[in-house]
Amino acid sequence: IITTVALKVAGMSWFMAMNLALASVATGGFSYQYESLMEFETVYVEMIVIIAMVAASLNFALYYKIYQHNFKVFWIDTERKAYFWIIGIATFLITWNLYYTGYFDAATSFRHALFQTVSIASTTGFASSDFNLWPDFSRYVLLLLMFVGGCSGSTAGGMKVSRFVILLKVTWAELRRTIHPRLVYSIKMGGRNVPPVVVGNVTRLSLIHISEPTRR
C-alpha cells in the first residue's frame, strides 16, 4: 500500500502504481510495459522501487524484531550487513566502470548502477537501462549478484546471502588451515556457532547451485 501510494504521488496512474508496487514487493519483476522501468525515465519512481526491492529482499524475521522494538537485532544481523556491503561494493564497481568507459556521466552511472544492482541482487529483474549493452565488467558483476541473490526468509531468490557468507568463511578457514594444519575453527553467524552439519549442507547446496547452470 505504501509503495502504491508513493508511486501514485510520483506521477503514475493507480493501475500502473499498483502493478509496479506488487511486482516490486514480491521481487517478481513483472511489468506490462515492454521496456520495464526504462519507459518512465524518472529518478523518483526508480528510488521508490529500489526501497521496495531492498525491503522485500531482507529477512522478514527482522521486521518482526522491529515490531517487538528489538532494533539491536536488525543492526547487528550479519546477513543484513553483508547484503548491504554487497550492494554497496557492486554499485561502486559498476558506477566506476560505466563512467570510466564513457557509457554515462557520473550521476547517471550511479543512478543506473544502484538500480540494476538492487534489481539483480534481489532477483526482481526490473531494468532502468539496457544493461545487456553495458561493458563486460559490469555485466559480470551483475551475473555474480544473480547467483548470490537476497537474504534468507525473504521473497528473493538466489543462493541467499547467509549461505554465501558461510561459504566465504569456510573458504577463509580452509586457507588458514593450509598454513596452520592443526588449526581448529568454528563458523559463526550472528555471534553463534554454526553446527558442522549445517556448514556441510550449505557447502554442498551452494556448489550444486553454482554448478547447475554450467551443467545445463
Question: Where does each model-flagged region fall?
Answer:
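Membrane-proximal intracellular helices of multi-pass ion channels
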Residues: I1-R216
